[in-house]
Every structure is written in C-alpha cells, then in structure tokens.
A protein has these predicted regions:
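12-transmembrane solute porter fold
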Residues: 1-148, 187-199, 203-208, 213
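A membrane-interface helix-boundary motif in multi-pass transporters
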Residues: 143-193
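Intrinsic disorder in cytosolic terminal tails and internal cytosolic loops
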Residues: 169, 173, 206-220
Length: 220
C-alpha cells in the first residue's frame, strides 16, 4: 500500500494541473482531504485496535484504500475536482486505519527486546516501497506519455516540459496534450490500484495474534 499511496500523492496533483487545467494551489487542495483523512483515521484507528482487533481493522482500512484506488482509475478529463477529493479521502482514511494495524501486527509477532528493530524495519520497508513505486510509476508515465504524444502527431520532447516545468513558467496545454496526459496518468492509477489490491490480499496472511493475547503470553 505504501507503493500505491506515495505514487498517488505524487501524481494526483499532476493530473489536476495538466489534465483538469487548474492551478498548483488547486492541486494541493485536492490532496489535502487525503492527508486530513489519514491523520484523523490514524487517531481513531489506534483506539479501535483494542476493540475491533488489528486484523479486522487492517482489512477494513485496506479495503477502503483499494476502493479509493479503483475509483481513481475511472477518472478522466471530464471528471470533477470534488469527485477526486472524495476518492482520495477514502484512500487517506484507509491508510490511516491500516497503518496502525500493520504496526501492531508486526509488534505482536516479535519478542519485546526486538520491538524497536521490527518497527524500524516496517517503516524502512514502507519508505522503500514508496520510493520504488514512485520511480516505477514515473517511468511508466514518461514512456506512455511520449508514446501518446507521438501517436497524436505531437513532439515527444514535450514530456520534459510537462513533467518538469521551469519554476514560474506556465506550460500551455491544449486538448491533445491533455488527452495524452490523461491516458498516461491513467496507467499510473492502474498500477497503484493493482499494487494496493496485492496489499489487500497480503493482509489476510498477517498473524492473527491480538494485543490481549500478547499481553497474557508476556505475563506468563
């Protein structure tokens, strides 16, 4: 899910600017609900773990995230910004609920003296997954965009200007370029959804030892 999450955060603003034709400010506003949902759900999730159980909470959170990621694959040039904000909010809430459950799942499977190492390894793995995800999605986006521009009779060199514009310089994007960009970013969203779906499958294979059981073992 880290792969899909970091990839989405990186490329959703690009879609809002290049395809919907809005400003950088509006692009930032679009992903704000995702971050707010993430933080809020994390706080709530920590309280729910003891009552619901980390595995159920992980399934619920990851399912929400996967649903949001799937809905993002349905957006296009005619989609509204509000619709995208709803979808990314689902993803943010899903991550907020699932991350605490993953943390507890790891911590309940190791001995107390190894808690620090296990937690650090989890954080490192998530960061590495996010970095790898952004790299793979960025490469896929560049290749697909260059192909789309060539097929439309446009200059493939526009890829650099579109993906890495100069500060303070607004790139004029016509309809053909917007369609090419929409198709390229759609591939990114599909990759994010597929990786999130694999994450959901992996949740069902997490250890099912809850906090209360772990506490009893420690006391004995």
């Amino acid at each position: 899910t880290g792969w899909a999450m970091f990839g989405s955060v990186s490329f959703i603003p690009l879609f809002v600017q290049s395809v919907l034709g809005t400003s950088a400010t509006q692009a930032g506003i679009t992903i704000t609900p995702m971050l707010l949902g993430w933080v809020t759900a994390s706080i709530i999730g920590m309280r729910l773990i003891l009552t619901v159980g980390h595995r159920k909470l992980g399934v619920i959170g990851t399912t929400l995230f996967v649903t949001g990621a799937f809905l993002m694959t349905l957006i296009g040039p005619n989609s509204s910004q509000i619709m995208m904000m709803v979808f990314v909010t689902m993803m943010g809430v899903g991550m907020g609920l699932s991350i605490p459950s993953f943390l507890v799942a790891v911590q309940t499977t190791v001995e107390r003296r190894n808690l620090g190492t296990a937690t650090s390894l989890l954080q490192f793995s998530r960061s590495m997954g996010g970095t790898l995800g952004v790299s793979v999605m960025g490469a896929a986006l560049s290749i697909r965009l260059a192909s789309n521009l060539s097929a439309s009779g446009l200059d493939p060199k526009l890829v650099t200007a579109l993906l890495d514009p100069l500060p303070g310089v607004e790139v004029v994007v016509d309809t053909g370029v917007r369609l090419a960009m929409a198709n390229a970013i759609h591939l990114v969203f599909v990759i994010a959804f597929v990786s999130a779906a694999f994450g959901l499958v992996a949740v069902f294979f997490t250890p099912h030892q809850e906090l209360k059981e772990k506490s009893l073992e420690s006391e004995s």
